[in-house]
């Protein structure tokens, strides 16, 4: 009985799927959640992009492709190609992820309360497709320290973005 139960796992609330027990126990493997919205996700996304955008994971700090990008242009949602951030609003917060103080236009990003990991944070998502971008933090003193127009830091996963040069 225990062997049979070990060959199943919960992938989302109320959904159970069968897994290969020979590979399911490997710690480096991550399994994507299966959702009813699967068909709405860009088929060209990498596994890492799917984990970040759809399953709300966070890429490792200091590993993102756009962390040190200084080119002029616009950052778009990697899933739906919606413009989200202008390069002029990007700044170096030294947090390990690209940081922006303002979205490209009001309403491009949606804000949601996130109480995961025992912390109260605000999650930011693409308003068009709902893809997870990262989190927003306020009141950290960036306005005074760097002379930014806003004291807001959008901490964004590079995996959730595509960059288009001007």
Model-assigned labels for residue ranges:
Residues 31-166:
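A short Gly-Trp-Pro
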Residues 1-36:
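N-terminal mitochondrial targeting presequence
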